Amino acid sequence: MAIYVTLNRILEQRGVTLTELSDRLGMTLANLSILKTNKARAIRFSTLDALCRELDCEPGDLLAYEED
């Protein structure tokens, strides 16, 4: 089982850079980069909520599931 964060796709669709998102959310660029590159082992609901609010999307838009 593999769950992926599709932040890169959403950012491209919205025309937003990771740096802009970092500034808007008050999150570090390093933490957002970890999410964007799928190196995160977990994500807090508060982070998911903030991303959804800022990017005007649903949690399912930011996450994808693929079977191994």
List where the protein language model places each region:
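Residues within the helices of the helix-turn-helix
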Residues: 8, 19, 49
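The alpha-helix within a helix-turn-helix
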Residues: 11, 22, 52
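Short, basic-rich loop-to-helix N-cap that marks the start of a DNA-contacting helix
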Residues: 39-50
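A short, Lys/Arg-rich alpha-helix, primarily the initiator
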Residues: 1-16
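Short C-terminal boundary/hinge segments that cap the last helix of small helical domains
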Residues: 56-68
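Short alpha-helical DNA-recognition segment
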Residues: 16-34
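DNA major-groove recognition helix of helix-turn-helix
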Residues: 36, 47, 66
